[in-house]
Every structure is written in C-alpha cells, then in structure tokens.
Design a protein with these regions (language model features):
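Accessory, non-catalytic peripheral segments of nucleic-acid enzymes
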Residues: 249-427
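His/Asp/Glu-rich metal-coordinating catalytic cores
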Residues: 44, 55-70, 74-222, 226-231, ...
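N-terminal active-site segment of His-dependent metallophosphoesterases
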Residues: 1-68, 74, 404-407, 425-427
C-alpha cells in the first residue's frame, strides 16, 4: 500500500535541472514500491491518493506511471486506487472534475474509486480469499475539518461486503488519534470508523505523510505515509510504504518498508547570530529591548563580529549538492540591518552548496533601539515591502530637489507591482 507520492511537482523555485532531478527522485521512490510488490509476489497494489502533486502532471510523469502500472499488471497484481486532495480537481469545470487516474482506469490499468460520497465495493477473489475493496476519493469542496465518512452511503447491489472474507477501505484523510490536531484538511472520527460496516475490517489512509498503525475497534487502521519526505520537521516522518497480508481474520504482518529519503537540513539563525551586538538590546533579566544609550554603556570592547554572510556560510558547510535546506532567520533587527541582510548572496550560496535553499524570513521584525524600552513583540512588526517603500520615498523626498513628481510616479508603480506580487503569493 502506498500513497502521497506527489509526482510531477511544479517546484518553481528550483532551476530546471534541479527540478528534473527532484522529480526523478520522486519517480524512483514510487518505482521502489512497485519493485517491492513484484519481488514479494503481492496480489493487490493499493494506492491511497495524491499519486500526483497536482491535476496536470507532465506527460513524462504520466507515461512513467503508465509503465509502472503495466509492470504490475504483467506480474498479475491488481491495482486499486483513490484520488487525493492534490490530484483531484477542485471544480467540475476543471478537466470535467476528473483526476489523471481516470486515464489509467479507462485503459484497465487500475480500478479507480472516483466517488467522494458513496462507497461502491468490488469483490476480488485471490487464491480462494474473497476481498471486498472500496474507496472514497477526496471531496475537494468539502468544508475543512469535515469527516468524509459522516454522510457517506454504501451502494452494494451485488452484496460484495456480505460475500467477502475480508474488506479493505481506502481513504485520503487524517484519522482521529493518529494525527495532530488540525493537521489534515479532513478527519475521520473514531465514531465514523465504529459505524462502518463490520465487513470493512482493514482501513488504509493517505494524506498524512507519517506511517502509523493502530487497531481501532477491531479494525486494523494503517496510514501508509509518503514515499519521499515532503516537508521539514519531526512531524514529516520517514519515507516508505506499507506492506500487509490479508487473511480471513483480517490483516497480519503489517509493517512499514523504509525508503532512503533525500537528505535535508533545517537551520535556524537568530539575528543575534548574525549581529552579536543585538544582544546588547536585551537585558539579562527581562529580555526587554532597551535604548541605544544603555546598550552603548554595556558594550564591551571586542573585535568586530563576523559578517552575516560568513555566519551563514559556516552553517551551510555541512550541506551537500543533495541536501534540501531550509534557513530560517528570526528575531529583531534594525532598519539598517534589514537593508544590510545579504539575501541575494545567501540564495547564491544555497544554490552552490545545497540542492536547494528555502530562505524563510517570516519571523523577522524591525525595532528601533533609540525608541526606549519595549518588548520585541510590540516592535514595528513583520517587515512589509510597502512600508519600506514609504520610508524610502520619505527619505528621498527630504533629500531630492525638484524631482517630486517623478518620485511619486515611481513609487505608485512600485506599490502596484508589490501589491500584485503579494496577491499572487496569497500574502
């Protein structure tokens, strides 16, 4: 069982070469799950959604998946699948509401459970074992936090559930008790699991990228995890997929098959790391920012600190051309330090020393050390390009002579461009 492979991501921040390398790595992880299924003589290959990272994958990745499904079919392995929140269109006007998996289903490459509000079980018989398989594709217009099983109905005119020795349900949602609060767009509650037909005694879920397994109310519930690590943090989990054996008693020998993920490094630097003199704007007791005069009185006579770029360079020393890196810079800084921050050089270093560098400055905020005592959290606040533009225009207006109209026109144009760019990013 696998899911959350997120093939064909757009990755706009990567260079074309790195983008193709990352996409190839994601394909290799999916192929590893197929290899394992064939090598271990699996009879069912179950996919729990988000095969692709969006609804319009590249033709290259579509063809790759077609080849992998052909390998499974040639090995006599039945592929069953549902759609996830990434690869299911959010509107019926997009691709007729059909996800890319429908193409493979039309060619008999997999059995696709495309409905999001009704379970239509299918009966499979493998080596004398009758297995009822059902699934719910993600409903893209459902309210956040809703339960996909809350108003679900069962359409089983052939009595697949009644005839089956064991039942397998595929879902793409968080499971209550197996995810963190508000982690998933939708969450299956324990009450909904308990209300399921008892014939569906094995549940496989996608969406959460960490593998997990619990026995809940007589059912085996497995979160398959993702085949490649997609985010930073301990909650990301490890890469891999799930293997289990179905019997008349349910699922047995459930295990997580680990895959080697692309290396990652998460670096956090405070502004005090970049400008050690900023420590002088805090007292040792209260942590308050104090005025410039007090800071100067406390300032020891030391050699100049390393430049911010040198500090970043040291932190990136452990990265390799394979390392996906995030650098978070946090804390207070003066307006002069904000303008001194070598963003372009940091990004260039990241391109040279790592596979990619995500520079996160959301937790930077400005403060004026001459303004007197105040808490850092009540400073000027998060940096705004529009505020910086206003400050720059005011400074230029004081020093400019006879160029006010041109300055105002340039400022208006920049405001429009900045507002449009922030709107596109959803900020």
């Amino acid at each position: 069982m696998t899911g959350d492979n997120h093939l064909s991501p757009r990755l706009p921040r990567l260079t074309p070469q790195r983008r193709e390398q990352r996409r190839e790595r994601l394909c290799q992880a999916f192929a590893a799950a197929v290899d394992y299924a064939i090598a271990h003589h699996a009879r069912i290959f179950a996919h729990v959604g988000d095969l692709f990272d969006h609804q319009t994958p590249s033709n290259r990745d579509r063809a790759f998946v077609a080849g992998e499904l052909a390998r499974l079919r040639q090995a006599g392995i039945i592929c069953v699948a549902i759609g996830g929140n990434h690869d299911t269109p959010r509107m019926q006007t997009e691709h007729g509401g059909a996800g890319p998996q429908w193409v493979y289903a039309a060619l008999d490459g997999l059995r696709y459970f495309g409905a999001s509000d009704v379970l239509r079980p299918e009966l499979l018989e493998i080596n004398g074992l009758r297995i009822a398989v059902a699934g719910l594709t993600n409903n893209p217009v459902a309210p956040p936090g809703s339960d996909p099983l809350a108003h679900m109905r069962v359409d089983d005119p052939k009595g697949a559930l009644a005839q089956a020795d064991v039942g397998l349900l595929l879902l793409h949602a968080a499971i209550e008790g197996m995810s963190m609060p508000n982690e998933g767009e939708r969450t299956v509650t324990l009450a909904s699991l308990d209300a399921l037909d008892p014939g569906l005694n094995v549940v496989a879920a996608g969406h959460i990228h960490r593998y997990a397994h619990q026995r809940i109310g007589g059912r085996e519930v497995v979160v398959t995890g993702s085949t490649e690590v997609m985010e930073f943090g301990a909650h990301a989990g490890g890469a891999g997929f799930a293997w289990l054996e179905l019997t008349r008693e349910g699922a047995q020998h459930i295990q997580h098959i680990h895959l080697e993920a692309q290396p990652r490094k998460d670096i956090t630097l405070s502004t005090e790391n970049l400008w050690p003199e900023n420590r002088l704007f805090r007292t040792g007791v209260t942590g308050k920012v104090v005025g410039r005069d007090a800071a100067l009185l406390e300032a020891p006579q030391t050699l100049p600190a390393a430049m911010p770029l040198e500090t970043v360079m040291r932190e990136l020393a452990g990265c390799t051309p394979e390392t996906i890196t995030r650098l978070r810079i946090t804390g207070p800084l003066t307006r002069d330090q904000y303008h001194e921050l070598p963003v372009r050089e940091i990004l260039r270093l990241g391109q040279e020393r790592a596979f990619s560098l995500d520079l996160d400055t959301r937790d930077l905020y400005l403060f004026d050390p001459a303004a007197g005592d105040f808490e850092p959290t009540t400073g000027i606040g998060p940096i705004s390009l529009l505020d910086e533009l206003d400050a720059l225009v005011a400074a230029r207006r004081q020093s400019a002579s006879g160029a006010g109209d041109d300055l105002d026109a340039a400022a208006r144009l920049l405001r429009e461009r900045i507002s449009a760019a922030e709107g596109e990013r959803g900020q």
